[in-house]
Amino acid sequence: MKKVISILCVIVMVLGLVAAFAGCEKRENVLKLYVPGQYIDEDIFEEFESWYKEQTGLSVKVKVKEFEEVENIQRDIEGAKADYDLICPSDYMVEYLISKNLVQEIDKSIIDISADGLVKPAYIDVMREYDPELKFSVPYMYGTLGILYDYSKTNAHVTSWDEYFSATYNGQRSVKQSIRDAYAAACIYNNSKKPAGSQLTIQQVFEDFSDETITAAKNTLKTALSASIWDIDNVKFDMAQGKSEASVALMWSCDAGYVMNTYEDDDGNEFEGNKNLWYCVPTEGGNVYMDNFCIGKYAVNTQAANYFLKFLCQKDIAVKNSEYAGAISPIAEAYDELYDYYMADEDGMFEDTAAGWKEMYIETMFPSAATLARCGVMKDIKTGKNALNAMWSDLVG
């Protein structure tokens, strides 16, 4: 009797598995995306699936997995040989993936980002720092790294790293718990203190991982961190809601702009933007970053991947994703539409704001040529990675 029951249990289990797999899509009909959390409007997926059917006659289902930090891409593609069709790495990670042959070339017969007028020329220049031939990546969102400050606390405009690192803001300084961002801020600050003839260009600063530079950055950060607040994720919300002791914070422009406008916190609660918050790319220099989409080395559905890249570059889709992510697309038509929208102030965002606040916000989201000229692009660390990681371990424990 027990044997009969066991056989019946096995049959039921097998039938259950068959039924389960019968409802699964074939891998070649799935487009697998690996992206940061809350960075793409998933409402566009059904629209893409219909559009792809119209374009090719083929069916596809978009499936998404989210990562917490861009380094996960390296681990999963290089180490685990994950078969994601599309991944969303930042600039320096694109450079690394290209060097290790971990991404595939984009099919330029489907989408060619070098085509005249598709991408804003300034951001094509940014891309050439990590994808010189524009063969492996399609730009998604850009931004800068600088300083967010609460004018109601500082009572003065903050414009430099010298001010950010000064003792004036001891106990009121927020440092992003990100090795690359904190290191960049310290290196730009330290470079500005060198004699004029020995200073590096801003791009050279982002390529310097010498022992001497790492040690100097460690000393700067060690002093700063002894009287700073760590920003793991929520300082922007705390500052916007008046709950933080921070007056100045190392911040990405997209996060700064997000909490200046009407926004939702991580729990979905809506808040009015804080018009006492200001943002700057410091006079000594900053970072311009680009997040991209690439086709992974072990991708299966490369045709759908290329068509999805083309889809992302359509104006309406790029605008939707910009509005969802709180960042700005470098796709020219989307960029121009968003710029015109903010300049027209159709929703009254800039009513009753301080003199210069509108101009500051526009500059935050749409940096001028002068601002971009004092920004460098983060690079793959070819030498010095172990020393940099050791420095960070010593600092954060």
Q: Where do the model's predicted regions map?
A:
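Ligand-binding pocket segment of bilobal, Venus flytrap-like solute-binding proteins
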Residues: 175, 182-186, 194-278
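Mature extracytoplasmic/periplasmic domains
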Residues: 24, 291, 296-371
